[in-house]
């Protein structure tokens, strides 16, 4: 039978919330007895926006804004049924986007 792995990708704008969520997932998986790889930090995506400060003139005066999207990757190797059930019951912070692939 083929080994079944679960890959969890987490994304958030705030890295503190993201680290807390990954720690919660890692503790839950370790408690159920499955082996885990990670959390692996993926490259942070930085989007910059440049806007004119004044409404009419002064092209030289501009303001820059940026959004940073932090990412983490967790691999669960050979998950037990208790692991899957515990992950489904897990309640994470609202600012974290979770993507799960089996």
Swiss-Prot record:
The keyword Ribonucleoprotein applies. InterPro entries: Ribosomal_uS10 (IPR001848), Ribosomal_uS10_CS (IPR018268), Ribosomal_uS10_dom (IPR027486), Ribosomal_uS10_dom_sf (IPR036838). SUPFAM superfamilies: Ribosomal protein S10. It holds the Pfam family Ribosomal_S10. GO terms for biological process: translation. The keyword Ribonucleoprotein applies. Keywords: Ribonucleoprotein, Ribosomal protein. One of its GO terms (molecular function) is tRNA binding. GO terms for cellular component: ribonucleoprotein complex; ribosome. NCBIfam families: PRK00596.1, rpsJ_bact. Part of the 30S ribosomal subunit. Belongs to the universal ribosomal protein uS10 family. Involved in the binding of tRNA to the ribosomes. This is Small ribosomal subunit protein uS10. It comes from Pelagibacter ubique (strain HTCC1062). The gene is rpsJ.
